[in-house]
Amino acid sequence: MEKRKIVFYLTIGMILILHLTACANRSSELPAPDSTVFGYEGETKIIFDGVCAKYNDKKEKNQVLLPIVQVLGTYEEGNITKIVSCVSLTEMSLEEGNLTIAGTNIFPMVTEIKYENEEYEVINLNSAETVLANGSASFPEVFLLICGPLEDVKQDIENRTFALPEMEKKKIREREYIEWSNVNVSTVNGDINYDEYFRLAD
């Protein structure tokens, strides 16, 4: 009788050990916490408190590495309203369709960014586009993403003028224009380096 009890308890113990081991293995295979995971294509997820981004990548449906940028503001209908840059432009590079900021790889999962002001254009991103980023000391709260084909990057920087809506209601002009000036673009192993940003047009 005692032997049967011992065998019974040993069997129960082994079953529990196997069950716990299986659970541990399953949990290690689960994706990262919800704040860093997007679901199905087109689904919108919150990536920071009060801020969300739309996921639209058919190849990857699991973990998304968060960018090293501060994101502030509120979100409405799945749109990011304000992005605050905390890295310099020279710390950014683009290689094989992936944007890298300060050494962290950001997969092109964010396909739509919209600012709080209605005048800001909704900028669609995908892996086939080059993502340019710029910031301004005059507008420290602005981190504008601009897209364009890789081969047209230098031409765009030299010839295009990008517009921002007015940042203060008291301003007479509807928009403050940003002009690229003295921008040196070089490509090394697929990485794009920017020596200078742009200046505000007079």
Model-derived regions: residue spans:
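Bacterial N-terminal signal peptides that target proteins for export
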Residues: 2-10
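Hydrophobic helical h-region of N-terminal Sec-dependent signal peptides
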Residues: 11-17
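C-terminal motif of bacterial Sec signal peptides marking the signal peptidase cleavage site
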Residues: 20-22
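Short, aromatic- and cysteine-enriched interfacial helices/patches
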Residues: 24-25, 198
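N-terminal export/targeting and maturation segments
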Residues: 25-89
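Mature extracytoplasmic domains of secretory-pathway proteins
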Residues: 66-132
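Low-complexity, intrinsically disordered terminal/linker segments enriched in charged
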Residues: 123-202
